[in-house]
Amino acid sequence: MRIEEDLKLGFKDVLIRPKRSTLKSRSDVELERQFTFKHSGQSWSGVPIIAANMDTVGTFSMASALASFDILTAVHKHFSVEEWQAFINNSSADVLKHVMVSTGTSDADFEKTKQILDLNPALNFVCIDVANGYSEHFVQFVAKAREAWPTKTICAGNVVTGEMCEELILSGADIVKVGIGPGSVCTTRVKTGVGYPQLSAVIECADAAHGLGGMIVSDGGCTTPGDVAKAFGGGADFVMLGGMLAGHEESGGRIVEENGEKFMLFYGMSSESAMKRHVGGVAEYRAAEGKTVKLPLRGQVENTARDILGGLRSACTYVGASRLKELTKRTTFIRVLEQENRIFNNL
């Protein structure tokens, strides 16, 4: 046993220090990034935000809606090959280039993903997703996927420390998914005692990944557009959003009605709700590590997308970054004990 004494920080623990700027307007900020990925060799340009691969977020409808904003969607792994075929038949090439195919690590997952990727060559992203990316089996699966799909861009996770980030990149991942326990409907930290404050995880993993020519996506912990800006400021190449994109018409959650008001169910992918839906229930040897919440319906996702992108542009103007690419270099974090004036928050 050992104790690390240095303080680890989440998004709520910091603010970004403003700096002198020559920008005249938020409209002067360029949010699009251009990337060439380490292993796949693929080039990609777009806004580096990803809708999470949760079945109440990462839907085909979400992918179609967010593609118009140049945003990616990691489509959840529970769609059938036939449903994928129908989606591809009704989608433009522009939509398909904004889609990630999500998969687990079983043999059945591998075969299903292979069938989906064979449907259309425009599907260039694979998201290999498990709750605990520290297992040897997971690393071996990433290597297997890289061998099978040498020209596909592979995103793999989740991990929160530099050494495991390096391990995954060396095994074939182009992008490492960073985050254990920060999600709005994740209870891993309270069920297991395991986790890592998200901002510190992003900073540590970005340093490790960039040293090897890899990239990271910050997955979880964002509750506001300001948190998205902090994730990019901390070195994230991409930011994945779940709760911020839940509750919309495109989100795919079940709608329930209480006292004449409609709500949409949103749950973690390790929750009892998710396991009942997809595997028949919680296995006797494990505990649910997610919760289910009811969200007031939020309308179409386009309004939320505009709000997120607008906040991100504004953050860039406050530090003098004319491009999102410059935000990390222009960011100085200050530790704080407060984020906002909350006097009217309950009204």
Curated annotation (Swiss-Prot):
The record's section on PROSITE patterns has: IMP_DH_GMP_RED
Binding positions (NADP(+)):
108-131, 216-239
- UniProt-annotated catalytic positions: 186 (thioimidate intermediate)
- List the Pfam families: IMPDH
Q: GO MF annotations for this entry?
A: GMP reductase activity; metal ion binding
Which reaction equations make up its catalytic activity? IMP + NH4(+) + NADP(+) = GMP + NADPH + 2 H(+)
Q: Please name the InterPro entries in this protein's record.
A: Aldolase_TIM (IPR013785), GMP_reductase (IPR050139), GMPR (IPR005993), IMP_DH/GMP_Rdtase_CS (IPR015875), IMP_DH_GMPRt (IPR001093)
A single GO BP term for this record reads: purine nucleotide metabolic process
Q: Which cysteines are joined by disulfide bonds?
A: none
Q: Where does K(+) bind?
A: 181, 183
Gene Ontology CC entries for this record: cytosol; GMP reductase complex
What keywords is this UniProt entry annotated with? Metal-binding, NADP, Oxidoreductase, Potassium
EC assignment: 1.7.1.7
Q: What does this protein do?
A: Catalyzes the irreversible NADPH-dependent deamination of GMP to IMP. It functions in the conversion of nucleobase, nucleoside and nucleotide derivatives of G to A nucleotides, and in maintaining the intracellular balance of A and G nucleotides.
Which NCBIfam families does the UniProt record give?
A: GMP_reduct_1, PRK05096.1
Quaternary structure annotation from Swiss-Prot or TrEMBL: Homotetramer.
Instruction: Give the PANTHER family listed for this entry.
Output: GMP REDUCTASE (PTHR43170:SF5)
In which family does this protein belong, per the annotation? Belongs to the IMPDH/GMPR family. GuaC type 1 subfamily.
Listed HAMAP family: GMP_reduct_type1
**Annotated protein name in UniProt:** GMP reductase
Q: Which gene encodes it?
A: guaC
